[in-house]
């Protein structure tokens, strides 16, 4: 019985990169790009790369409270309690920085 030759054999990868070899290369490149992108996004959010991460011992600049915080605290002209006061524990510098920067 004579064997038939299939010229459109997808399993045959020649030097031109046709068939399955070419498809596998494209899939590999796409997967690598997606994985690298996800790693960069995760590292940026964690502060491992970029300037968004908190530095140990570094002073952060004072920022103006947002209008939402102003309304909650009685308006922009209301004086905040003295440091160390237990009157409003939600308005400490640490909690304000935490609310602003996550």
Curated annotation (Swiss-Prot):
One GO location term (cellular component): membrane
Record field: transmembrane: 24-44
Name of the protein: Uncharacterized membrane protein ECU08_1550
Disordered, as annotated region: 1-21, 49-102
Compositionally biased region (Basic and acidic residues): 56-73
Subcellular localization, as worded in the UniProt entry: Membrane
Top-level taxonomic group: Eukaryota
Compositionally biased spans, kind Polar residues: 93-102
Keywords carried by this UniProt record: Glycoprotein, Membrane, Transmembrane, Transmembrane helix
Residues annotated as glycosylated: 16, 90
Membrane topology: Single-pass membrane protein
